[in-house]
A protein has these predicted regions:
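Class I S-adenosyl-L-methionine
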Residues: 1-142
Length: 142
């Protein structure tokens, strides 16, 4: 545990907050999409064409579902294997997220952190939410 804290640059308070959040997420049970996503604390897990990059696929009549997770060790977990080389220039701080950070809201980062932690704390619920969202988008695309 001490290695995890030092590796992620966390103090005792931050580490305890992370543990509490991970416990909360780990104990979430599937109750249907709407109830579960509300309990997780985000509006959605992923979406089709939610960014300028993903909207380009619509020009080719392809719906691309994407999930934005927290970059490098922002969530306490690293989901980017190359972050050591690029975290200083990461696109995580660009676009709408840059505006959100400048306005001091932090809601985009907070949402990405929750999604990333859910992935590690409760993979079953994460996958059920993701599959549910993809199925909804697939039906709409047909």
């Amino acid at each position: 545990m001490a290695d995890f804290k030092s590796k992620n640059g966390m103090n005792e308070v931050e580490y305890n907050e992370l543990q509490n959040e991970m416990d909360r997420l780990a104990n979430i049970k599937w109750q249907g999409y709407a109830k579960t996503i509300k309990e997780v604390g985000v509006s959605y897990l992923g979406a089709v064409a939610q960014s300028a990059k993903l909207r380009h696929s619509l020009y080719h009549k392809v719906s691309t579902y994407g999930i934005y997770l927290a970059s490098a060790n922002l969530s306490g977990f690293n989901v980017c294997p190359n972050s050591e080389y690029c975290k200083d220039n990461c696109l995580n701080g660009s676009g709408h997220n840059r505006l959100d950070r400048l306005s001091k809201k932090g809601s985009i980062d907070r949402s990405r952190i929750i999604k990333t932690r859910l992935f590690f704390a409760n993979r079953e619920v994460f996958m059920r939410i993701m599959i549910n969202e993809i199925e909804k988008k697939r039906k709409k695309a047909e």
